[in-house]
Structure formats: structure tokens, C-alpha cells
From Swiss-Prot:
Keywords: Early protein, Membrane, Transmembrane, Transmembrane helix. It is a single-pass membrane protein. Induction: Expressed in the early phase of the viral replicative cycle. The lineage of its organism: Viruses, Varidnaviria, Bamfordvirae, Nucleocytoviricota, Pokkesviricetes. It comes from African swine fever virus (strain Badajoz 1971 Vero-adapted). It comes from the Viruses. The chain crosses the membrane at residues 4-24. Its main location: membrane. This is Uncharacterized membrane protein pNG4. It is found in: Membrane. GO terms for cellular component: membrane.
Length: 44
């Protein structure tokens, strides 16, 4: 039982980290898109 629970905890931690990384990447892409749009608007 202890081995199974520890594996589940590790798997859950990995899942949380992966979800956080994906969310951060998507958030950064939105931020970069907004930044580049503002930059293009300023140059034009």
C-alpha cells in the first residue's frame, strides 16, 4: 500500500508540474503576442 501511495503522490506531483509548465508557456505566449502587438502599433 505504501509503495502504491508514494507512486500516486509522485505521479500527482509530476502532473501538477506539467500542468503548471503548460499554463506558464501559454501565458507567456499570450504575453509575448500582446507585447509584439504593442511594439508593432508603436512602430506603425
Amino acid at each position: 500500500m505504501f509503495d502504491i501511495s508514494s507512486i500516486l503522490i509522485r505521479g500527482g506531483g509530476v502532473l501538477i508540474v506539467v500542468i503548471l509548465l503548460l499554463w506558464i508557456v501559454e501565458h507567456n505566449e499570450d504575453f509575448i503576442d500582446a507585447k509584439s502587438m504593442n511594439y508593432n502599433n508603436q512602430t506603425v
